[in-house]
């Protein structure tokens, strides 16, 4: 009797979904140029999914983009009438019972919520899904695809289980379960994209998943910033962050001066200050796969070199981003007592971030990759702005950073400090390494995202 009741209850729950799925399949046939894009994260901090949506819209698809709306996406996305952003609510864990139980309940509730959100949207010919995070979104998107006739496209940025392993350890039962889940449901997708050739080979060899490498490329708005725009940005940031403010007042009280530039009141001409500090930029999501103690230790060594009389400039170090370890590193930064270095950690508007990269002298990347198979998009953006980079070494970094060509690769804080000393000696030096790297980046004529997407992704969605 109890078994019959359970079967009847399951049918009652499943029948409406099957009927709705059949109706959506019919609807999908009438809307073959529609794509649903899903990221179980902050849309504003998911540039690659924003770029997918913009490229799809540019080539005639309408796009529904589902994700958390914690930060503002780029204006191009918001102003495109082919793209609709649907906000998801980030569910909080229950503060009851063991942590494993709390996590399990959250995953189940998140799955039901995402299923409900997807089933009541216009069905798409494709569901584009960012992974990670893939728990529970891979299974839910596959299930919705089965009901609605949509083809699931997974864009592999990394492995979710490897990120969990940084917190819990690689052999934790939750991590092993997440790996099995990711591997099993990942094989059920229709198309797979990934960010490096190393990941493509790993997916093929160890997961039996065929993927196409779609390298991260800078969007068109990542470019060198004209001096006039640099000055406006510095003045804007100076109103909120003291490192951008002028170190001394100009002789003419109507002259506008920042820490790096000044605008002549009469002609409106902007010039760089002769004794300006060097501007070093790093971007981070403040997670375990980026050890910012390396940068802080290198800055301490740089400070000591300056105090010892080496011909080095003052430094303004800007670290942008949001994430769980931001407060921890902010406390470490405040404990430092630098005389020649100023560090600030702003969260920039989407439109200001490319302008900052295009205004900086050097980028630093501390991303090491939990899997060793993904590449830091921040470096891609920096290269788009012709900004040379010092990057910490890991397995497949050579696919992006060419040592002594477009930047430098380091292993530890000692090596990074030596690189900073070499690059900033006699700053600004027109004949120095920094300018040579910048020249190489200008001459490389790298593909932009739109051009790369047309060559790699568009044929896949047009042919299948």
From Swiss-Prot:
The processes (GO biological process) annotated in the record are: dolichol-linked oligosaccharide biosynthetic process; protein glycosylation; protein N-linked glycosylation
List the membrane topology term(s).
Single-pass membrane protein
Impact when changing residue 276 to W = In CDG1K; decreased function in protein glycosylation as shown by rescue assays in an ALG1-deficient yeast strain
Annotated EC: 2.4.1.142
Location of the protein in the cell = Endoplasmic reticulum membrane
Which residues lie in the membrane yet do not traverse it?
100-120
Q: Which reaction does it catalyse?
A: an N,N'-diacetylchitobiosyl-diphospho-di-trans,poly-cis-dolichol + GDP-alpha-D-mannose = a beta-D-Man-(1->4)-beta-D-GlcNAc-(1->4)-alpha-D-GlcNAc-diphospho-di-trans,poly-cis-dolichol + GDP + H(+)
Q: Which Pfam families match?
A: Glycos_transf_1
The record gives the effect of mutating residue 429 to E as: No effect on function in protein glycosylation as shown by rescue assays in an ALG1-deficient yeast strain
- Location of the region described as Disordered in the Swiss-Prot/TrEMBL record: 243-262
Q: Which InterPro entries does this one have?
A: ALG1-like (IPR026051), Glyco_trans_1 (IPR001296)
**Keyword Zinc assigned:** no
Q: What class of enzyme is it?
A: transferase
The record's keywords, sorted A to Z, are: Congenital disorder of glycosylation, Disease variant, Endoplasmic reticulum, Glycosyltransferase, Membrane, Phosphoprotein, Signal-anchor, Transferase, Transmembrane, Transmembrane helix
Pathway assignment reads:
Protein modification; protein glycosylation
What transmembrane ranges does the database entry give? 3-23
Which positions carry Phosphoserine?
Answer: 242
The impact of changing residue 342 to P is: In CDG1K; decreased function in protein glycosylation as shown by rescue assays in an ALG1-deficient yeast strain
Q: Name one GO molecular function term.
A: chitobiosyldiphosphodolichol beta-mannosyltransferase activity
Return the SUPFAM superfamilies for the record: UDP-Glycosyltransferase/glycogen phosphorylase (SSF53756)
- Which regions form coiled coils? none
Q: Which residues lie on this side of the membrane: Lumenal?
A: 1-2
Q: Which family does it belong to?
A: Belongs to the glycosyltransferase group 1 family. Glycosyltransferase 33 subfamily.
Give the record's disease field.
Answer: Congenital disorder of glycosylation 1K: A form of congenital disorder of glycosylation, a multisystem disorder caused by a defect in glycoprotein biosynthesis and characterized by under-glycosylated serum glycoproteins. Congenital disorders of glycosylation result in a wide variety of clinical features, such as defects in the nervous system development, psychomotor retardation, dysmorphic features, hypotonia, coagulation disorders, and immunodeficiency.
Report the protein name in the record. Chitobiosyldiphosphodolichol beta-mannosyltransferase
This protein's species is Homo sapiens
């Amino acid at each position: 009797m109890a078994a019959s009741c359970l079967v009847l209850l399951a049918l009652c729950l499943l029948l409406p979904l099957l009927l709705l799925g059949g109706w959506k399949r019919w609807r999908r046939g009438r809307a073959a140029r529609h794509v649903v894009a899903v990221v179980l994260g902050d849309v504003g901090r998911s540039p690659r999914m924003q770029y997918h949506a913009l490229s799809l819209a540019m080539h005639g698809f309408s796009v529904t983009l589902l994700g958390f709306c914690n930060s503002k996406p780029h204006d191009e996305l918001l102003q495109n009438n082919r793209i609709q952003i649907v906000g998801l609510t980030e569910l909080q864990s229950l503060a009851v019972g063991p942590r494993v139980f709390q996590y399990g309940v959250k995953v189940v509730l998140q799955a039901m919520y995402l299923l409900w959100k997807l089933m009541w949207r216009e069905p798409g010919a494709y569901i584009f899904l960012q992974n990670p995070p893939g728990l529970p979104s891979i299974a839910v998107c596959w299930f919705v695809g089965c009901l609605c006739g949509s083809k699931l496209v997974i864009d592999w940025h990394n492995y979710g289980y490897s990120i969990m392993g940084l917190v819990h350890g690689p052999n934790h039962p939750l991590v092993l379960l997440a790996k099995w889940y990711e591997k099993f449901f990942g094989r059920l997708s229709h198309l797979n994209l990934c960010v490096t050739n190393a990941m493509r080979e790993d997916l093929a060899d160890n997961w039996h998943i065929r993927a196409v490498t779609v390298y991260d490329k800078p969007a068109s708005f990542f470019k060198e910033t004209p001096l006039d725009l640099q000055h406006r940005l510095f003045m804007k940031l100076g109103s909120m962050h003291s490192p951008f403010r002028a170190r001394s007042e100009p002789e003419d009280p109507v002259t506008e001066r920042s820490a790096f530039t000044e605008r002549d009141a009469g002609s409106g001409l902007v010039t760089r200050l002769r004794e300006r500090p060097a501007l070093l930029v790093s971007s981070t999501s403040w997670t375990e796969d980026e050890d910012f103690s390396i940068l802080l230790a290198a800055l301490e060594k740089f400070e000591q070199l300056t105090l010892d009389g080496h011909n080095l400039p003052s430094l303004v170090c800007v670290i942008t981003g949001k994430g769980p370890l931001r407060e921890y590193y902010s406390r470490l930064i405040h404990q430092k007592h630098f005389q020649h270095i100023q560090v600030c950690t702003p969260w920039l508007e989407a439109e200001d971030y490319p302008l900052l990269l295009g205004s900086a002298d050097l980028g630093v990347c501390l991303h090491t990759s939990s899997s060793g198979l993904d590449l830091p998009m921040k470096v891609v953006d920096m290269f788009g702005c012709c900004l040379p980079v010092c990057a910490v070494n890991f397995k497949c970094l050579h696919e992006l950073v060419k040592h002594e060509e477009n930047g430098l690769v380091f292993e530890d804080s000692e090596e990074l400090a030596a690189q900073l000393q070499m690059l900033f000696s006699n700053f600004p030096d027109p004949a120095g390494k920094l300018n040579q790297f910048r020249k190489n980046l200008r001459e490389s004529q790298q593909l932009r995202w739109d051009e790369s997407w047309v060559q790699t992704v568009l044929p896949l969605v047009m042919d299948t």
